[in-house]
């Protein structure tokens, strides 16, 4: 028995079967769909390049949000996404979700950002630990973490990478992200 099916994109597939009964199986593709477009910097290789864009997206929020910026090999911004929306105190972050997006976009670099609702830009221990885990997993996958930053409605931001390095320098340690 010979069966030819044409797909919507013009390609076709061919079934060559004997007398065995065949059944249809759904084929699923995982892809990212653009929701809307924003004016964003062309390239992001450090926190300063991204700060105003990030602050305008999540800095004025009433709940904590976590955002990822994905860049190609030359630091050109590919896409950005909100990966978590929390409450007024915290946002739960799934590291797998971050890297699923980065891998689907073939990103070479990522920058993570989240907002604090109050005036404090000091990272919590949880902020530091999750940043270190993201950096570790990124190294394994070949995706560099440029930084993780905290923004609020104010005129400044906090680099968690810089905060960790300054804290370790103060404590006499050399380990970095």
Where are the predicted features?
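Mobile, glycine- and charge-enriched loop segments
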Residues: 50-56, 60-91
């Amino acid at each position: 028995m010979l069966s030819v099916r044409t797909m919507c994109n013009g390609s076709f597939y061919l079934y060559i079967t004997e007398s065995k009964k065949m059944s249809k199986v759904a084929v699923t593709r995982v892809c990212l769909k653009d929701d809307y477009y924003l004016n964003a910097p062309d390239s992001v290789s450090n926190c300063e390049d991204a700060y105003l864009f990030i602050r305008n997206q999540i800095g004025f929020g009433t709940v904590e949000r976590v955002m990822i910026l994905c860049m190609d090999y030359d630091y050109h911004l590919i896409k950005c996404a909100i990966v978590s929306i929390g409450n007024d105190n915290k946002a739960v972050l799934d590291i797998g979700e971050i890297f699923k997006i980065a891998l689907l976009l073939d990103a070479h670099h990522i920058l993570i950002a989240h907002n604090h609702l109050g005036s404090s830009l000091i990272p919590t221990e949880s902020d530091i630990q999750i940043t270190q885990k993201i950096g570790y997993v990124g190294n394994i996958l070949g995706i560099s973490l440029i930084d993780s930053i905290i923004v609020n409605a104010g005129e400044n931001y906090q680099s968690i990478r810089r905060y960790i390095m300054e804290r370790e320098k103060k404590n006499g340690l050399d380990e970095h992200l």
